[in-house]
């Protein structure tokens, strides 16, 4: 029998036993053909590899991620991640959908890539409703019906609107879930349910959703798995405490390791492989970590042709020089080498072509000093204000109350150690501008501005001086989107994202370096978080606990109630553009 490749005496990861055994592995065309121990087998390989000192594992599968989080396009992303052993991803391109709708999704899906990209239907575009946030695109029933016909669509993307899912039978998200269940009854329905437990969890799961990838904690982690939830561990959930729950309860079949979001600068260092290593360091046996990054995600997504090394399965695999350090020597996709250690990153020969209109999409007005004068009608010298307080770990926020002086009819927010947070509708639909306050997010004078503001991607700017806020907003508008940091009336760092204000086609090293400079500039201003970019960009995400901001205002993300900036009993904010 003629075969293409024969790997001899390799230490093979045997999925069924979750152990390593020494075997010979034959590959024919793009699939595994024969796996055997004995030497008297009549095979004629075109290429023989002596791999007796290497470890062979299936290609890594990322079952929940967003390519847009890396701020790059599918072809560039593909080139970047195959070197980390990732051979299959399930992408939820809801950032692209929020900006460009179905047209943008199809542009993403048409990309030709080295790794296999399957797609989730963005279920929550917008993440709440058009009455709570303004987006460029909307994915409704008609769009979902069209996407259900696509062969690369294999699941419903994370359903995020807790209130609509649990308590509003006629909501759009419930209608989308019903449509998917009718037309594709075996298709996985992905969920987003942070800080939900007890009967509220049951209400959420009753809709048919069966997974969660949000920030996990030991108590609710066990409760969710016992309730039938498939858990997807992103980086911040990979803790010794959470891993102990998995190990103690033998929950390996009910969880996988994912990335969710990997920033462009972090992509220079790794991808799913880094989370696998982190899980091992947190106490997960390496054999179980491999299982949860290959087999369980494949099984979850119905990808029965991959996820293990066995006859007839797709020949996606890695050769490791060392198991403990997860040192990748070679990556194979469909039986072909796509990466060898020491090989530099090559920019793709062919990348996506987007219409010119995708690069002129930010339609905000330029802010002026007059726009930032917060006038208050009150008889009091101080007024109570609702203020957002961020955390230094994770993306959750809280609402606190602060007494803020009023002088000559103007709110003196700077004297209360606050920063002004502004969200501006950027699609030319309604011109909304909302104003909120944050409690001491910066220790130095400056401002941060971005259009990479989850999930609606309106223009968001936050700062503690009027001059820096104006500079940051005006320059970001001229740049047509991205990230920008200003201090002392100078631009300190920029990361241009000209495609819809969320993506760049620059080489990944250049893009990553630009974002790293933005991150360092944010740190220099004293913005503290374990992931500064994601922390800032989710201040606008109205499905992330507990208080976030859209172009309509400051919102309690669970009740979907808006809070006024000034307590009504104390005064009224007189600003014509304030919602």
UniProtKB/Swiss-Prot annotation:
Catalytic activity: adenine + H2O + H(+) = hypoxanthine + NH4(+)
InterPro entries according to UniProt: Adenine_deam, Adenine_deam_C, Amidohydro-rel, Metal-dep_hydrolase_composite, Metal_Hydrolase
Cofactor(s) this protein requires: Mn(2+)
GO annotation, biological process: adenine catabolic process
CDD domains linked to this entry: AdeC
The UniProt record lists the keyword Manganese: yes
Pfam families: Adenine_deam_C (PF13382), Amidohydro_1 (PF01979)
Transmembrane segments: none
Keywords noted in UniProt: Hydrolase, Manganese
Keyword Glycosyltransferase attached: no
EC identifiers of the protein: 3.5.4.2
GO molecular function: adenine deaminase activity
HAMAP family: Adenine_deamin
Family indicated by similarity: Belongs to the metallo-dependent hydrolases superfamily. Adenine deaminase family.
Protein name: Adenine deaminase
Gene: ade
């Amino acid at each position: 029998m003629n075969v293409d490749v024969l790997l001899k005496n390799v230490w093979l990861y045997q999925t069924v036993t979750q152990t390593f055994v020494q075997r010979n592995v034959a590959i024919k065309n793009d699939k595994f053909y024969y796996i055997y121990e004995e030497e008297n087998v009549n095979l004629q390989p075109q290429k023989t590899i002596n791999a007796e000192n290497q470890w062979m594992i299936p290609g890594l599968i990322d079952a929940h991620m967003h390519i847009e989080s890396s701020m790059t396009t599918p072809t560039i992303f593909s080139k970047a991640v195959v070197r980390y052993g990732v051979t299959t991803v399930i992408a939820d391109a809801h950032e692209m959908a929020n900006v460009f709708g179905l047209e943008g999704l199809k542009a993403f899906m048409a990309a030709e890539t080295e790794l296999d990209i399957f797609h989730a239907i963005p279920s929550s575009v917008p993440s709440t409703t058009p009455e709570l946030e303004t987006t460029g695109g909307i994915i409704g029933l008609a769009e979902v019906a069209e996407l259900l016909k696509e062969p690369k669509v294999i699941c419903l993307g994370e359903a995020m609107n807790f209130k609509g899912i649990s308590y509003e039978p006629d909501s759009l998200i419930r209608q989308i879930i019903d449509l998917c269940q009718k037309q594709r009854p075996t298709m996985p329905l992905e969920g987003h349910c942070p800080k939900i437990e007890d009967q509220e969890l049951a209400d959420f799961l009753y809709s048919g959703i069966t997974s969660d990838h949000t920030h996990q904690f030991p108590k609710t982690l066990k409760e969710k798995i016992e309730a039938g939830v498939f858990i997807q561990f992103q980086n911040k959930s990979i803790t010794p405490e959470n891993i102990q729950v998995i190990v103690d309860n033998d929950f390996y079949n009910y969880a996988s390791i994912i990335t969710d979001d990997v920033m462009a600068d972090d992509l220079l260092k790794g991808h799913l492989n880094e989370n696998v290593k982190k899980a091992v360091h947190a106490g997960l046996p390496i054999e179980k970590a491999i299982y949860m990054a290959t087999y369980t995600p494949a099984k979850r997504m119905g990808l029965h042709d991959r996820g293990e090394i066995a006859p007839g399965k797709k020949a996606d695999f890695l050769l490791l020089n060392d198991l403990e350090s997860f040192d990748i020597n070679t990556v194979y996709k469909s039986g072909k080498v796509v990466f060898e250690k020491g090989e530099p990153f090559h920019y793709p020969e062919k990348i996506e072509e987007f219409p010119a209109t995708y690069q002129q999409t930010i339609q905000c007005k330029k802010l002026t000093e007059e726009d930032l004068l917060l006038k208050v009608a009150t008889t009091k010298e101080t007024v109570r204000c609702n203020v957002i307080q961020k955390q230094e770990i994770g993306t959750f926020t809280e609402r606190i109350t602060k007494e803020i002086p009023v002088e000559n009819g103007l709110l003196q927010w700077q004297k209360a150690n606050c920063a002004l947070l502004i969200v501006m509708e950027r699609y030319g639909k309604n011109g909304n501008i909302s104003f909120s306050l944050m409690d001491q997010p910066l220790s130095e004078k400056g401002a941060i501005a971005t259009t990479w503001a989850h999930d609606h991607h309106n223009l968001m700017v936050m700062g503690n001086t009027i001059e820096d806020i104006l500079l940051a907003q005006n320059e970001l508008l001229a740049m047509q989107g991205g990230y920008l940091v200003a201090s002392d009336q100078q631009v300190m760092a920029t990361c241009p994202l000209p495609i819809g204000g969320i993506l760049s086609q620059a080489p990944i090293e250049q893009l990553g370096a630009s974002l790293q400079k933005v991150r360092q500039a944010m740190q220099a201003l004293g913005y503290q978080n374990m992931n500064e970019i994601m922390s800032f960009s989710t201040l606008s995400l109205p499905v992330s606990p507990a208080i976030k901001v859209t172009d309509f205002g400051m919102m309690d993300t669970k009740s979907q109630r808006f809070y006024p900036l000034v307590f009504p009993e104390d005064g009224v904010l007189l600003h014509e553009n304030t919602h």
